[in-house]
C-alpha cells in the first residue's frame, strides 16, 4: 500500500536514464519531476508501486531509471535488474536526506522472515545500482534483527538517503558501497557485514544503547574497510545515551573500521570499542576526530594510525568511475 502525492510541478532536472555516476545531479537543486527516460511511480505516474515499475524493466540489460513521487510505499523490494539502475526520489533538495518525501517501509524480523536478507525492506543484488533521496525503513523495532536495506552487490551508491531501524538496520553484505549525505539510524550493530564501504558526510544516529558497527571481515586477504569520514555520530532526537554507545564490535575476527575527520558526541563510551567474536583481533582506528566522545585515552582494542585512509584504499582504483562526485 502507498499514499503518494505530488507537491506540484517545479523546476525539474533534465537527465538521461543512467545507472552509472549521475554527474548531472547538483547540490541544492530540486527534483520534482522525472528525469528524462525514467519510468514513473506515484498517483500521476505510470505505475502505482515501485515493485510494478521494477517488474516492467523485464530482462533488459540497458541502463534504466525509475522516478518515485512523494509518498509512503509499503513494499518489500528486491533489486535484481540486470543493467545499471538508478532509483530517484522526489525532493526539493537533492543534497540532503532531510527534505526527502519518499519512504519505502516494511515490518518483519529476520526470525519471522527466515533470514536477514529476507527481512530487508530493500534487498539490492544488482551491481551498479544507485539510489537518491529515498528513505528506507524496517518498522519492527526492538526485540529482533530486522534489516532496512541489504547491499549484496558491487559498486552501489546511495545519495541523500535515510535508513532506519533498530537492530541490524544496514546490512552492507558484500562488494564496494558508497554512502554520501545519508542518515543511518539504529541501536545494535546497525551497520554490519563484509562489504568495503565509504560513509561520507553522513549522520550516524543511535536510538538506543549498543554498538554502531559490526564488521564481518575475517581474513587478512580481505581488502575491506568501513571508513566513516566527515560524519556526525549522535543520539536520536529526544534520546539520552551518554557513554552508552560503542563505535563497533567484531562480528568476525578481523573486523576493520576507521572513524576519521568526524564529530563523535558524548554518546560514545570512553572505551570506544567492545567485544563480540571469540578470538577476535580487530583493526580499529580513529583519526582526527572531534567532539565530546573523541578522547581516545581510555580506548580499548584500538590500533594507532598516522593518517586518514582514502577512497582508493577502501573502494579500489576505479572508484571515480562509478560514484557520483557531485556529492
From Swiss-Prot:
Output the SUPFAM superfamilies linked to this UniProt entry.
Pectin lyase-like
Q: Which domain of life is it from?
A: Eukaryota
Coiled coil residues, start to end: none
One of the entry's Gene Ontology molecular-function terms is: pectinesterase activity
Annotated site residue numbers, Transition state stabilizer: 167
Q: A single GO CC term, please?
A: extracellular region
Which residues are recorded as binding substrate? 145, 249, 251
Q: Which residues form the signal peptide?
A: 1-19
Q: What's the protein called, per UniProt?
A: Probable pectinesterase A
Amino acid at each position: 500500500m502507498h499514499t503518494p502525492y505530488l507537491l506540484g510541478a517545479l523546476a525539474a532536472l533534465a537527465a538521461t536514464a543512467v545507472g552509472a555516476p549521475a554527474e548531472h545531479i547538483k547540490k541544492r537543486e530540486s527534483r520534482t519531476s522525472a528525469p528524462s527516460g525514467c519510468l514513473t511511480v506515484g498517483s500521476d505516474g505510470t505505475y502505482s508501486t515501485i515493485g510494478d515499475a521494477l517488474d516492467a524493466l523485464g530482462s533488459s540489460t540497458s541502463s534504466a531509471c525509475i522516478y518515485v513521487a512523494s509518498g509512503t510505499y509499503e513494499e518489500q523490494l528486491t533489486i535484481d535488474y540486470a543493467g545499471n539502475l538508478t532509483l530517484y526520489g522526489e525532493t526539493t533538495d537533492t543534497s540532503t536526506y532531510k527534505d526527502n518525501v519518499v519512504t519505502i517501509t516494511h515490518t518483519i524480523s529476520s526470525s519471522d522472515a527466515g533470514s536477514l536478507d529476507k527481512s530487508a525492506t530493500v534487498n539490492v543484488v544488482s551491481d551498479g545500482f544507485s539510489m537518491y533521496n529515498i528513505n528506507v525503513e524496517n518498522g519492527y523495532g526492538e526485540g529482533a534483527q530486522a534489516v532496512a536495506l541489504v547491499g549484496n552487490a558491487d559498486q552501489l551508491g546511495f545519495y541523500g538517503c535515510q535508513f532506519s531501524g533498530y537492530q541490524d538496520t544496514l546490512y552492507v553484505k558484500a562488494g564496494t558501497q558508497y554512502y554520501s549525505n545519508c542518515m543511518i539510524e539504529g541501536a545494535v550493530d546497525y551497520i554490519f557485514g563484509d562489504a568495503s564501504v565509504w560513509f561520507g558526510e553522513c549522520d550516524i544516529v543511535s536510538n538506543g544503547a549498543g554498538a554502531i558497527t559490526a564488521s564481518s571481515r575475517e581474513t587478512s586477504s580481505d581488502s575491506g574497510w568501513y571508513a566513516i569520514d566527515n560524519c556526525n555520530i549522535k543520539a536520536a532526537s529526544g534520546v539520552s545515551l551518554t557513554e552508552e554507545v560503542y563505535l563497533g564490535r567484531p562480528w568476525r575476527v578481523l573486523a576493520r573500521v576507521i572513524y576519521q575527520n568526524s564529530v563523535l558526541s558524548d554518546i560514545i563510551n570512553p572505551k570506544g570499542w567492545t567485544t563480540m567474536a571469540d578470538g577476535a583481533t580487530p583493526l580499529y582506528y580513529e583519526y582526527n576526530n572531534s567532539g565530546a566522545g573523541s578522547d581516545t585515552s581510555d580506548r580499548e582494542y584500538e590500533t594507532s594510525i598516522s593518517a586518514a585512509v582514502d577512497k582508493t584504499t577502501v573502494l579500489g582504483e576505479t572508484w571515480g568511475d562509478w560514484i557520483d562526485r557531485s556529492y
